[in-house]
């Protein structure tokens, strides 16, 4: 039996997490991790909804036979303990240390009414 097993390589276990690129910006999404996978569910923290942009670097987790998209690579350099929420076009909310809330964007709206700036 020992001789019959010589030359055989054991199967490699499949990775449980991979970095890939979003190919379809929707939910379910498409993602490239060496081959394209479609119908990949998109997950985020509770109360937070997002969709990856096409070409964005994403984290793909294996969930049984399926995969799920769990997030994108972080950009920027927040201080330890800070929380940044960034959107397209430079809009951002930054929860900083000391209780400071920093809001950046071209307009600030409350219940649809423009408080500052101009809505395009």
Model-inferred region functions:
Residues 2-23, 48-120:
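Right-handed beta-helix
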Residues 28-39:
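Short, basic/aromatic beta-hairpin or loop at an interaction surface
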Residues 37-50:
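Beta-strand/loop nucleic-acid-binding surfaces
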């Amino acid at each position: 039996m020992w001789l019959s097993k010589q030359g055989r390589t054991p199967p490699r276990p499949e990775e449980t997490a991979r970095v890939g690129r979003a190919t379809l910006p929707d939910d379910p999404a498409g993602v490239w991790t060496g081959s394209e996978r479609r119908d990949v569910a998109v997950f985020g923290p509770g109360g937070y909804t997002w969709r990856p942009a096409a070409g964005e670097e994403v984290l793909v987790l294996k969930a049984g036979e399926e995969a799920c998209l769990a997030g994108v690579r972080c950009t920027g350099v927040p201080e330890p303990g800070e929380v940044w929420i960034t959107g397209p076009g430079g809009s951002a909310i930054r929860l900083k240390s000391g209780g400071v809330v920093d809001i950046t964007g071209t307009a600030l709206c409350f219940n649809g009414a423009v408080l500052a700036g101009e809505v395009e």
